[in-house]
Curated annotation (Swiss-Prot):
GO terms for cellular component: membrane. It holds the Pfam family Mab-21_C. The gene is Itpripl2. The keyword Membrane applies. This is Inositol 1,4,5-trisphosphate receptor-interacting protein-like 2. It is a single-pass type I membrane protein. It comes from Mus musculus (Mouse).
């Protein structure tokens, strides 16, 4: 993405004047030195033209500065305030919140579709070769040594904001699901933990997956199945309540090792196009593939990119099991798991396919010029502005409460409550739509309403996203903000409202052209657009 620069006229014109003066002086110095050899010493007034040129340049610069000062005085509201009447006239000339939002969106938030398209295509080619190499290295079933193992399914699924048209700032990070294939002798029996009464809210969105024998037409005995699957159970499962459960930790460990071997296979073939490296991950941060452009690659829009490769186990109907969500606090109360549950056996659920269908369904019914995706992008930018000035730990906690997924769910919830985007979501009402979302988030943070998962909610969106696996249809509703304690939610709501009230001032300081930041925002505009009632 191109870097944008703004021209400072206060520096530009003196610099041009000085440069022109230096060039004229150099020209006359060289000319006078040549003429001095041929002329007699009585030509002592040869420096007079140089003095005239310098005086003319100086007068021209003074005239330009005087013209600029006169224009500033003649413009309404540009002079210094001389009483209440002049201050009111000046406040009318200040750019409103809508203009500031549009300027900030164009200069700081909006992505170039051209650059984003090239970046996504480049990522698809690199990840596609890596996944195909991983698939060729092993297949499900019996492998050397007689053990059963996982394998790459051979495809990948692009998820996240870059593929849902609401990514902001730079197209340098992407999320990709890498589906894994189970051996044919292994089947899963997933179970939701949402109905566990003794479980803390942070883990009620998790699932556990016990192993079970797949339906067999030959009627093989259960004992024989246990003996056949023993290598797989010992390598990828942990014991929970007397049954073997698939472990996200052990699957991630195998996934990282298999990625390293696959990357070694394709690294040589990629040398002419890019340099690739793999950073190991954890349950909170999956392995990251770093793609750096080569000097010999002259392709368009080559950037340094980071691709998070997320191992995923397919449940059915486009729903995948992934690593569980991180705990609400860095300390993470994993010791509070009751009933013999183990943290290694917990899984999260990824419904990116259903959410993409839901966004497509809304786009089909939205009027031309609907700005709900732009509002989502500006909501993310508002969150980032609110994190300024916080220490790293507080900024991380703020980002977890108002994560991108929470903000996207809030936008979807508001739209689904209205049925579909109405004409009120036109770009002409951008600031009003953003204010509506801020109020909705404030109510959710203050527990005046719940913010349910858009697929795992009480009503859900099953009619719009298509069929769901039975385990999801029967799962308890998931409130995305329930894992956070009331005090943290109240602080987040207060900071969100404070950021919204100061938004015009923040936009003048941190974004947009310089002409929007010449004067401080008047008090009437700083208050404009903020929610009336506070927590």
């Amino acid at each position: 993405m191109s870097v944008r620069y703004t021209l400072n006229l206060r520096v530009f014109w003196p610099l041009v004047t000085g440069l022109c003066t230096a060039l004229v002086c150099l020209y006359h110095a060289l000319r006078s030195s040549e003429d001095a050899r041929a002329e007699s010493p009585d030509g002592a007034d040869s420096g007079f033209p140089l003095l005239k040129v310098a005086i003319l340049l100086l007068l021209g610069y003074i005239l330009l500065r005087c013209r600029h000062a006169i224009r500033q005085r003649l413009l309404p509201g540009s002079s210094r305030p001389r009483g209440h009447a002049n201050f009111s006239a000046r406040s009318l000339q200040e750019p409103g919140l809508s203009i500031l939002l549009e300027s900030y969106y164009e200069h700081e938030v909006r992505l170039s579709p051209h650059v984003l398209g090239h970046s996504k295509a480049h990522v698809s080619r690199i990840v596609g070769e890596l996944v195909q190499a991983g698939r060729a290295r092993g297949s499900p079933g019996l492998i050397t040594g007689g053990a059963l193992a996982l394998a790459f399914r051979g495809d990948f699924i692009q998820v996240g904001s870059a593929y849902e048209q609401h990514k902001i700032r730079r197209p340098d990070s992407f999320d990709v699901l890498v589906p894994l294939r189970l051996p044919p002798q292994v089947a899963l029996e997933p179970r939701s933990l949402g109905t566990e009464p003794s479980l803390t809210p942070a883990f009620r969105s998790c699932f556990v997956c016990a192993l079970k024998a797949p339906p067999s037409p030959s009627g093989a005995s259960t004992g024989q199945w246990h003996r056949d699957c023993k290598p797989f159970a010992e390598g990828f499962c942990v014991d929970v309540q007397g049954r073997r459960h698939l472990s996200a930790t052990l699957v991630l460990r195998w996934f990282q090792a298999h990625l390293q071997r696959s990357l070694a296979t394709v690294r040589y073939s990629l040398e002419g196009r890019c340099r690739v490296s793999l950073t190991p991950g954890s349950l909170e941060q999956p392995p990251t593939l770093h793609i750096l452009p080569c000097r010999t690659d002259y392709g368009c829009c080559r950037l340094s990119m980071a691709v998070r490769l997320i191992p995923a186990v397919h449940l059915g109907d486009g729903v995948f099991l992934v690593a569980p969500p991180p705990p609400p606090s860095p300390s993470g109360a994993l010791s509070e798991l009751p009933g013999g549950l183990r943290a290694e056996a917990l899984w999260g659920v990824n419904t990116a396919r259903q959410e993409q269908k839901l966004l497509g369904w809304l786009q089909e019914r939205a009027p031309p010029g609907a700005c709900y995706l732009k509002c989502l992008q500006l909501l993310k930018a508002l969150r980032d502005l609110g994190a300024r000035g916080l220490d790293p730990m507080a900024a991380t906690h703020w980002g977890r409460i108002l994560s991108s997924y929470v903000l996207k769910t809030a936008v979807l919830e508001v739209l689904l409550n209205e049925g579909s985007p109405t004409p009120s979501w036109d770009e002409a009402h951008l600031s009003e739509c953003l204010e509506k979302l801020v109020k909705f988030l404030r109510d959710c943070l203050l527990r005046r309403r719940d913010l349910f998962h858009c697929v795992l909610g009480p009503t859900g969106a099953a009619a719009e996203v298509g069929p769901l696996p039975k385990v999801l249809r029967e799962a308890a509703p998931v409130d995305l903000l329930a894992p956070f304690d009331p005090h943290s939610r109240e602080l987040a709501a207060a900071r969100l409202l404070s950021t919204w009230r100061r938004l015009p001032q923040l936009l003048r300081v941190y974004g947009g052209p310089r002409y929007l930041a010449r004067c401080p925002a008047p008090r009437s505009q700083r208050i404009q657009g903020s929610p009336e009632d506070e927590p």
